């Protein structure tokens, strides 16, 4: 039907006859001449109909979002009427004929006025929202990114192999989406949270290098950057080590950013241990564009009478830190400090102590804070020296249980960095490595990543003889600008070590056999050393397109309650369907 997209129309086509198709983006009547901006996925082109044209009445009857096909001759725009904002802005099409393919009702919101439209309305009419050039750009970028990744992995010997969606329910940290079986009454499939076990089994099968662009599902409470169904770049390889995965993935991600948005990353990426990341930034996914670091002052506060600091300073499970904000005296108002105090409270902090450094030559008198009177001058100036604080700086303090301090002050660091625009560069990719194998909660061990991550031991004897809480894993996360974009590990490839890890996690031999028997069996039939990584496509596209809303980069996303406002899913099903599956719905008690 068409000969050209809108973006193809330029001065090189002057005098040529073209056919375009698209939506009426805007209609204007200037002195009896009809000007139409026609929109397709590539942009806009101006179509002009003069009153003496046989199709003038049709052009005059058009309204926003009508779908049309038009023929005409490309002409240079009159001098001074060029539009530098669009690729076809030097030319216009003098219309010969026009056909209305379909009319449109008045749309529920104007495409140019989307910011004043509630997100619920945009999600209900998602097919309208997706007509916006900004939204189309994000999904086109997504398509280009996935194409680049496929080409890179294909060219590096990885095989695209599909794994099942209907599989066995296994615990991986979040709730499974369950699918009832009609053939096996009372039994259920689970939608995969990841293809983890299947990709490991492909390594046992000898495929050596695997990848898949795959949907995954998690029935969990949603955050702003989470969806119940999400897309992974899933990768696994055999006879490799951490260095192979990290160097290969650096090349892939660096190439992806250069190809899609023209950004060049220096390689190799910075590598930071988990312990250093927590110690300096309170987070295992630090945003290194922000030049603020924690300074440990635990030892300095141990002998002070100020219990708010000395209590945690003498508790092995706690920490006391200072965070210097250069020029913070002028940049942070009393109102902002009060807001930050409320902010850290979200993470369990009981308060937010601070000191303003007005004058270093006046001793205590040059320091402004409610806490100054409670701390000796010697200790105060030790802290000032440790933090390299200068006049005009402000110090924030975190004191308490280590997790609360890390979470609250890590979040505060990120917030202040954004509020004060402290970013010293545009991009900061890094690897975080040497994660603990386990984390403890309610006196029980949990896998920091997942139960198939290899510990840094060479035998089951080493595993048995090491305190589980002191074990490191062979895991690695890629972090860009404070987002964990990918996570992976070298896997356990020996059956005895895998069985022992299950045991340490409180999974009995019988339970392990019932849930993971097929995997344990596979490990006994000659399993190579193998490892891999998975990248969240959605988060990568968020970074590539500069959005903070994950729903912007998914064509048909769910809300934060995991519902689809457009299709009204989830929905009830007929009693006949439920009976066929042997399911009875229990009514919610009120």
UniProtKB/Swiss-Prot annotation:
Residues 196-199 are annotated as: Aspartate. The keyword Ligase applies. Keywords: Aminoacyl-tRNA synthetase, ATP-binding, Cytoplasm, Ligase, Nucleotide-binding, Protein biosynthesis. ATP binds at residues 218-220, 227, 484, 536-539. Disulfide bonds: none annotated. One of its GO terms (molecular function) is aspartate-tRNA(Asn) ligase activity. SUPFAM superfamilies: Class II aaRS and biotin synthetases, GAD domain-like, Nucleic acid-binding proteins. The record marks 30, 80 as: Important for tRNA non-discrimination. GO terms for biological process: aspartyl-tRNA aminoacylation. InterPro entries: Aa-tRNA-synt_II, aa-tRNA-synth_II, aa-tRNA-synth_II/BPL/LPL, Asp-tRNA-ligase_1, Asp-tRNA-ligase_1_N, Asp/Asn-tRNA-synth_IIb, AspRS_core, GAD-like_sf. It catalyses: tRNA(Asx) + L-aspartate + ATP = L-aspartyl-tRNA(Asx) + AMP + diphosphate. L-aspartate binds at residues 172, 218, 449, 491. One of its GO terms (cellular component) is cytoplasm. Its EC number is 6.1.1.23. It is found in: Cytoplasm. Aspartyl-tRNA synthetase with relaxed tRNA specificity since it is able to aspartylate not only its cognate tRNA(Asp) but also tRNA(Asn). Reaction proceeds in two steps: L-aspartate is first activated by ATP to form Asp-AMP and then transferred to the acceptor end of tRNA(Asp/Asn). Belongs to the class-II aminoacyl-tRNA synthetase family. Type 1 subfamily. Homodimer. This is Aspartate--tRNA(Asp/Asn) ligase. It comes from Francisella tularensis subsp. tularensis (strain SCHU S4 / Schu 4). The lineage of its organism: Bacteria, Pseudomonadati, Pseudomonadota, Gammaproteobacteria, Thiotrichales. The gene is aspS.
């Amino acid at each position: 039907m068409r000969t050209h997209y809108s973006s193809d129309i330029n001065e090189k086509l002057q005098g040529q006859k073209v056919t375009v198709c698209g939506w009426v983006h805007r209609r204007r009547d200037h002195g009896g001449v009809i000007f139409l901006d026609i929109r397709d996925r590539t942009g806009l082109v101006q179509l002009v109909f003069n009153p003496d044209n046989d199709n003038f009445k049709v052009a005059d009857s058009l309204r926003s979002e009508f779908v049309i096909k038009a023929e005409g001759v490309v002409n240079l725009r009159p001098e001074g009427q060029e539009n530098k904002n669009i690729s076809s802005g030097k030319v216009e099409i003098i219309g010969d004929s026009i056909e209305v393919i379909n009319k449109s009702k008045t749309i529920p919101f104007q495409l140019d006025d989307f910011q004043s439209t509630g997100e619920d309305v945009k999600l209900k009419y998602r097919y309208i929202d997706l007509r916006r050039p900004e939204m189309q750009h994000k999904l086109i970028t997504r398509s280009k990114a996935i194409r680049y990744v496929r080409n890179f992995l294909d060219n590096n010997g990885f095989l695209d192999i599909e794994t099942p969606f209907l599989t066995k329910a296994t615990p991986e940290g979040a709730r499974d989406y369950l699918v009832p079986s009609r053939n096996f009454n009372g039994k259920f499939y689970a939608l995969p949270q990841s293809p983890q076990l299947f990709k490991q089994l492909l390594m046992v099968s000898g495929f050596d290098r695997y990848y898949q662009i795959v949907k995954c599902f998690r029935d969990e409470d949603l955050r702003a950057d989470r969806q119940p169904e999400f897309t992974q770049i899933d990768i696994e390889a055999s006879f490799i080590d951490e260095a192979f995965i990290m160097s290969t993935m650096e090349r892939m991600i660096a190439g992806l950013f250069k190809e899609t948005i023209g950004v060049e990353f220096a390689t190799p990426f910075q590598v930071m241990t988990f312990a250093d990341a927590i110690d300096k930034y309170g987070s295992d996914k630090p945003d290194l564009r922000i030049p603020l670091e924690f300074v440990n002052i635990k030892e300095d506060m141990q002998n002070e009478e100020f219990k708010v600091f000395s209590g945690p300073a003498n508790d092995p499970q706690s920490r006391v830190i200072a965070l210097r904000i250069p020029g913070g005296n002028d940049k942070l108002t009393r109102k902002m400090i009060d807001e930050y105090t409320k902010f850290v409270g979200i993470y369990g902090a009981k308060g937010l102590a601070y000191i303003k450094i007005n004058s270093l030559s006046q001793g205590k008198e040059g320091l402004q804070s409610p806490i100054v009177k409670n701390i000796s001058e010697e200790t105060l100036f030790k802290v000032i020296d440790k933090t390299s604080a200068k006049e005009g700086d402000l110090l924030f303090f975190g004191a308490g249980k280590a997790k609360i301090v890390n979470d609250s002050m890590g979040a505060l660091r990120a917030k202040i960095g954004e509020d004060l625009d402290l970013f010293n560069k545009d991009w900061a990719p890094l690897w975080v490595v040497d994660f603990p194998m386990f984390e403890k909660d309610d006196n029980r061990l949990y896998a920091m990543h997942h139960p198939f991550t290899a510990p840094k031991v060479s035998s089951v004897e080493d595993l048995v003889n090491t305190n589980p809480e002191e074990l490191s894993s062979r895991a690695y996360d890629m972090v860009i600008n404070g987002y964990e974009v990918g996570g992976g590990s070298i896997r356990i490839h020996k059956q005895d070590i895998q069985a022992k890890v299950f045991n340490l996690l409180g999974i009995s031999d019988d339970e392990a056999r019932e849930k993971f028997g097929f995997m344990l069996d596979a490990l006994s039939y000659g399993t190579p050393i193998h490892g891999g990584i998975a990248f969240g496509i959605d988060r990568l596209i968020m970074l590539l397109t500069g959005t903070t809303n994950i729903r912007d980069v998914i064509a048909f996303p769910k809300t934060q309650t995991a519902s689809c406002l457009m299709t009204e899913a989830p929905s009830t099903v007929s009693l006949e369907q439920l009976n066929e599956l042997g399911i009875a719905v229990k009514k919610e008690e009120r």
